[in-house]
Structure formats: structure tokens, C-alpha cells
């Protein structure tokens, strides 16, 4: 492995990257938050179903 070649490719990617605008950042946060809420709701739904079944938790 040639470390200089790998480092130069990493530097090239970092130079191309830019910071997101506020709208893009808030949209990413909103989508990530919605995903977290969805997974939590799904877990709660599974827990509720397992509790209602005979011999559940």
C-alpha cells in the first residue's frame, strides 16, 4: 500500500466537499429525526403486540 497515493485521494475528496447550506442541513436533520421516530414507533408497536399475545412479556 502506498500511503502517499491514499492520502492524496483523501485530500482530493476533502477539497471537493463543501459544507451544506442551512436548508440542506435542516432537511437532513428532519429526515433523520423522522426515521428515529419511525423506528421507535415500530419498536413500541412490536412490544404492544407481544404484550397482548398470551404468554407475552
From Swiss-Prot:
Membrane topology field: Single-pass membrane protein
- Spell out the subcellular localization from the entry: Cell membrane
InterPro entries assigned to the protein according to its UniProt record, in alphabetical order: Prot_translocase_SecE_dom_sf, Translocase_Sec61-g, Translocase_SecE/Sec61-g
Q: Name one GO molecular function term.
A: protein transmembrane transporter activity
Q: Name one GO biological process term.
A: intracellular protein transmembrane transport
> Which domain of life, per UniProt?
Archaea
Q: Which residues cross the membrane?
A: 30-50
Disulfide-bonded cysteines: none
The primary site where this protein sits is membrane
Q: Which family does it belong to?
A: Belongs to the SecE/SEC61-gamma family.
Q: What does this protein do?
A: Essential subunit of the Sec protein translocation channel SecYEG. Clamps together the 2 halves of SecY. May contact the channel plug during translocation.
Q: What name does the UniProt record give this protein?
A: Protein translocase subunit SecE
**Organism (species):** Haloquadratum walsbyi (strain DSM 16790 / HBSQ001)
Q: State the organism's lineage.
A: Archaea, Methanobacteriati, Methanobacteriota, Stenosarchaea group, Halobacteria
Gene name linked to the record = secE
Amino acid at each position: 500500500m502506498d500511503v502517499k497515493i491514499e492520502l492524496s485521494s483523501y485530500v482530493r475528496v476533502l477539497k471537493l466537499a463543501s459544507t451544506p447550506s442551512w436548508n440542506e442541513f435542516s432537511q437532513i436533520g428532519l429526515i433523520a429525526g423522522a426515521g428515529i421516530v419511525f423506528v421507535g414507533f415500530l419498536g413500541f408497536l412490536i412490544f404492544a403486540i407481544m404484550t397482548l399475545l398470551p404468554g407475552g412479556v
